[in-house]
């Protein structure tokens, strides 16, 4: 890694999986939805090369050509497998309320959208020049529910309330209550509204209809669970 001249930007280029169709396009659509929900992510785009799309995203640990000190959740505390424990880390690092609300939004989005690969290396913290820690923008936000034996199943790496699947709206609300997150109901409802736009966004990205159907069905099932008054 080298220093860049003024005006240049550090990027990460994620090449499409040669064995799975539309990996870049799906990640881009999930990026669009996550940012529409209010989740912080670095600017990203699809980069076409020789007829294939690849996912290009700015690095969150580089600003104005300088490297920011960052550490994954795993490197800071190791073997964290509950969202409740990430909130504990946030309190220990004294991050502002905004970051904790951002973390709650990520948890809700991940559980509804099927981002099951939410392990402790997919959460990071940045120490800024003032010496204060902040949670990093989200990254690696994409559908990972198993549908062709290459991705994880529907169980999350990071559990909520000792459950690694979505059981009820109360499961999410309890996570909010125990961590003093305000307006949890409206946050959940806003994320649901955005995720209901998946099919149109996926068609705009020219994703194959059978794959759209698979992801859409998962999202609909999760929304049904959240809206079931008996759960």
What residue ranges belong to the model's regions?
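Anionic ligand-binding catalytic core segments
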Residues: 1-120, 124-231
């Amino acid at each position: 890694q080298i220093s860049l001249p003024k005006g240049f930007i550090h990027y990460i280029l994620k090449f499409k999986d040669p064995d799975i169709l539309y990996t870049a396009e799906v990640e881009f659509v999930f990026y669009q939805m996550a940012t529409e929900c209010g989740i912080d992510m670095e600017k990203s785009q699809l980069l076409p090369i020789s007829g294939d799309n690849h996912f290009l995203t700015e690095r969150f640990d580089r600003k104005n050509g300088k490297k920011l000190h960052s550490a994954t959740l795993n490197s800071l505390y190791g073997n964290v497998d509950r969202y409740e424990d990430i909130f504990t880390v946030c309190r220990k690092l004294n991050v502002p309320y905004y970051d904790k609300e951002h973390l709650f939004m990520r948890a809700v989005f991940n559980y509804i959208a099927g981002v099951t690969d939410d392990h402790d290396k997919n959460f990071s913290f940045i120490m800024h020049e003032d010496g204060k820690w902040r949670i990093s923008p989200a990254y690696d936000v994409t559908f990972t529910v198993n549908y062709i034996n290459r991705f994880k199943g529907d169980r999350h790496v990071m559990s909520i309330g000792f459950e690694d699947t979505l059981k009820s709206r109360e499961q999410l609300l309890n996570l909010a209550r125990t961590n003093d997150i305000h307006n949890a109901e409206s946050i959940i409802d806003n994320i649901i509204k955005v995720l209901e736009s998946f099919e149109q966004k996926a068609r705009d990205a020219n994703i194959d209809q059978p794959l759209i159907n698979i992801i859409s069905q998962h999202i609909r099932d999760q929304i049904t669970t959240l809206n079931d008054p008996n759960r």
